Amino acid sequence: EKLERIDKVEPRLLPGVEDQVPTLFTEAGVVTRRVEETAHQAGFVFAVDPTSADASVVGGNIAMNAGGKKAVLWGTALDNLAWWRMVDPEGNWLEVTRIGHNRGKIHDVPVATFELTWKDGRHPPGATRVLRTERLEIPGSTFRKVGLGKDVTDKFLGGLPGIQKEGCDGIITSARWVVHRMPAHIRTVCLEFFGQARDAIPAIVEIR
C-alpha cells in the first residue's frame, strides 16, 4: 500500500485550542510538493518545504523533522503537526496528539503536551481497542539547541515518538498538519554576500 491519501484543507477544533484551526490530513506516502500545492489551492501555506519537496514524502519529513525556508516563520515538521499515527515495534498503532497547539514554533511554549494512545494493531485503527494511553509534558526548550535551532544530534526529544527518529522507533503512516496563511504584507531584505560565514552572521544579526 502506497499510503497516498491526501484530503482538502479543513478547519478542525484541536484539543486545548478554542478556535478552529485549518488543517490538512495526509498519509505518509504523499509527495511533499503535492501537499504544498493542495494547501496553496485553498489559500494556505504548508510550512514544511525541504529542498527535496519533489522527491520526499511527508512520512519521511516527520521521521527526519524536516524543515526548509518557511521554518523561519513556522518551524519544522514537529512545529506543524497536530496529530500523527505510526506503527510501533510491537506492531501496534500509536497515535500522538498535540494538546494546546500554539500554531507556531514549539520552543515558544513553556511546556508542550502530547497525548499518546496505543491501539491493538491486529485490526484497523478505527475499529480496534485501546491498549493504553500516556501523556507527555516536555519543556519547549527541549526541542531546540540554543543558538543553533534544531538539534539533529538529539534523537530522543524528550521521549516523543516518531519525530526525528529516522524510523528507528516505528513507521509513520499518516498525519494531520496545521497550515497557515501568509501575512498580508511582507518585507524583503537584500543582503550582500560575504566571503566568510563569520563575517556574514554578525551582519545578519545586526539587521533590525
Where are these regions (language model features)?
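FAD-binding subdomain of flavoenzyme oxidoreductases
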Residues: L3-G16, F25-A28, T32-I207
